Curated annotation (Swiss-Prot):
PROSITE patterns per record: HNF_P1, HOMEOBOX_1, HOMEOBOX_2, POU_4
Protein name: Hepatocyte nuclear factor 1-beta
Keywords attached to this entry: Activator, DNA-binding, Homeobox, Nucleus, Phosphoprotein, Transcription, Transcription regulation
Function of the protein: Transcription factor that binds to the inverted palindrome 5'-GTTAATNATTAAC-3'. Binds to the FPC element in the cAMP regulatory unit of the PLAU gene. Transcriptional activity is increased by coactivator PCBD1.
Record-listed Phosphoserine modification sites: S49, S52, S75, S80
Region spans: Disordered: 66-85, 323-348
Entry-linked Pfam families: HNF-1_N, HNF-1B_C
Main location: nucleus
InterPro entries attached to this UniProt entry: HD, HNF-1, HNF-1_N, HNF-1_POU, HNF1_dimer_N_dom_sf, HNF1b_C, HNF_P1, Homeodomain-like_sf
Region (Dimerization): 1-31
The family this protein is said to belong to: Belongs to the HNF1 homeobox family.
Gene3D superfamilies: Homeodomain-like (1.10.10.60), lambda repressor-like DNA-binding domains (1.10.260.40)
């Protein structure tokens, strides 16, 4: 006997014997601790001192609880497998108290399951619960088992004590018979249940009738009802068969009509009955798992809300990513709009002196796109004396100050012209340098020049954001260059003096008045484009005098 005990058990026995407990007293205590035939458990504290040995002859006390919980008992996953420290649950007490034939059959079934493999029985119970959508909470409420221990026993085969397994098997046998009775109910009984439920609803709406019709016997029954209504009502749970049907219907129609929902109700109830192995005509036996039209409506509404929420999350994530990607571009600038890297000698300063000593300071950025260098002008007019120069004609000129000086004669506001220079790293044959100037200055040039030819020049209607459309403007004057040499001689090193257009506009030294054209060109949407700019190519400005009056430059779009 001693050889089968562990070292800890041997130490415990030695401690008991050394405390004064005799062999006979120890054997008697062990016999009293054995389980009784009615599944009762005798709990008695063994004496730890010799003086308490006289009290061992007292009768043992059965500690039973109605709810299956006790302060001194171990938790569901503690103790050995065959420990007897688990109190008798109410379900076992009820089964033992019944003397009917049905109770005897249930006890025989429980004994048979206890004698079989626990893991095999656990898998059978788990499959039955999944088939009928039974939550583990219901088993815990009835048997008093620990839910964590129950889940581990059903899913992993964790060892469970005999008393606990007996309670679990008792619940399983009873649940089988209960569900079988539900599905075997006749249609008449189902109608009676419907009438009873409608009567209960009327009594709920008008409680005064229930108080008047309630007799003394009914009040006693009401007092005894709370003990039977401690268990919570099972929450409705969608089965896998119904979910598959609903998801397929959701793919076809996200918001079905009432007729479609009713058809889905019949289809889901039929699938639930087939899942449980019963005829679809017995759908009323589903009980709390019965699918209704309201539940189908709520299911579709919840799916639509979930889909809308997922779409919102996706759009928020996309917008945040776009903002994150744009931050470096806003701080460092676009790679297609980097400032020009031309040498400083290309930005030589030139100054025009008019009688009023007017100075126009501007700054511009050269943007590179492909092989052509486009000059985007955004100037800030600081001091402008000619009254005909509209302050709205603001252009940005190069970063380096451009000052042009010419002695004698008044000039049109060509000082607002941008500093055009050829880039050293671009092919000059492929570069196309454009000059932008206010339309008022161009009209003054057109009035002061003397020619018989007409030439079309594309005009850009400038707005604050430089977004415009080009239109042709007719010139009826001729360019002649009697004063080109003085300008080129005064500033031989100037880059602006080498441009034909800049040399051509300096011939108006004797003109001090800005003549206005009698028939100005018509522009579309003049209210939206109050000012206009002339854009032309510096390499082709010398061809203005040679082109015929019937030719016009094609319209360009920004």
């Amino acid at each position: 006997m001693v050889s089968k005990l562990t070292s800890l058990q041997q130490e415990l026995l030695s401690a008991l014997l050394s405390s004064g407990v005799t062999k006979e007293v120890l054997i008697q205590a062990l016999e009293e601790l054995l389980p009784s035939p009615n599944f009762g458990v005798k709990l008695e504290t063994l004496p730890l001192s010799p003086g308490s040995g006289a009290d061992l002859d007292t009768k043992p006390v059965f500690h039973t609880l109605t709810n299956g919980h006790a302060k001194g008992r171990l938790s569901g996953d503690e103790g050995s497998e065959d420990g007897d420290d688990y109190d008798t649950p109410p379900i076992l007490k009820e089964l033992q108290a019944l003397n009917t034939e049905e109770a005897a059959e249930q006890r025989a079934e429980v004994d048979r399951m206890l004698s079989e493999d626990p893991w095999r029985a656990a898998k059978m119970i788990k499959g039955y619960m999944q088939q009928h959508n039974i939550p583990q909470r219901e088993v815990v409420d009835v048997t008093g088992l620990n839910q964590s221990h129950l889940s581990q026993h059903l899913n992993k085969g964790t060892p469970m004590k005999t008393q606990k397994r007996a309670a679990l098997y008792t619940w399983y046998v009873r649940k089988q018979r209960e569900i079988l009775r539900q599905f075997n109910q006749t249609v008449q009984s189902s109608g009676n249940m419907t009438d009873k439920s409608s009567q209960d609803q009327l009594l709920f709406l008008f409680p005064e009738f229930s108080q008047q019709n309630q007799g003394p016997g009914q009040s006693e029954d009401t007092c005894s009802e709370p003990t039977n209504k401690k268990m919570r009502r099972n929450r409705f749970k969608w089965g896998p068969a119904s979910q598959q049907i609903l998801y397929q219907a959701y793919d076809r129609q996200k918001n079905p009509s009432k007729e479609e929902r009713e058809a889905l109700v019949e289809e889901c109830n039929r699938a639930e009955c087939l899942q449980r192995g019963v005829s679809p005509s017995k759908a009323h036996g589903l009980g709390s798992n019965l699918v209704t039209e309201v539940r189908v409506y709520n299911w579709f509404a919840n799916r639509r809300k979930e889909e809308a929420f997922r779409q919102k999350l996706a759009m928020d994530a996309y917008s945040s990513n776009q903002t994150h990607n744009l931050n470096p571009l806003l701080t460092h600038g676009s790679p297609h709009h980097q400032p020009s890297s031309s040498p400083p000698n290309k930005m030589s300063g030139v100054r025009y002196n008019q009688p009023g000593n007017n100075e126009v300071t501007s700054s511009s950025t050269i943007s590179h796109h492909g092989n052509s260098a486009m000059v985007t002008s955004q100037s800030v007019l600081q001091q402008v004396s000619p009254a005909s120069l509209d302050p709205g004609h603001s252009l940005l000129s190069p970063d380096s100050k451009m000052q042009i000086t010419v002695s004698g004669g008044g000039l049109p506001p060509v000082s607002t012209l941008t500093n055009i220079h050829s880039l050293s790293h671009h092919n000059p044959q492929q570069s196309q340098n454009l000059i932008m100037t206010p339309l008022s200055g161009v009209m003054a040039i057109a009035q002061s020049l003397n020619t018989s030819q007409a030439q079309g020049v594309p005009v850009i209607n400038s707005v604050a954001s430089s977004l415009a459309a080009l239109q042709p403007v007719q010139f009826s004057q001729q360019l002649h260059s009697p004063h080109q040499q003085p300008l080129m001689q005064q500033s031989p090193g100037s880059h602006m003096a080498q441009q034909p257009f800049m040399a051509a506009v300096t011939q108006l030294q004797n003109s001090h008045m800005y003549a206005h054209k009698q028939e100005p060109p018509q522009y579309s949407h003049t209210s939206r484009f109050p000012s206009a700019m002339v854009v032309t190519d510096t390499s082709s400005i010398n061809t203005l005098t040679s082109m015929s009056s019937s030719k016009q430059c094609p319209l360009q779009a920004w």
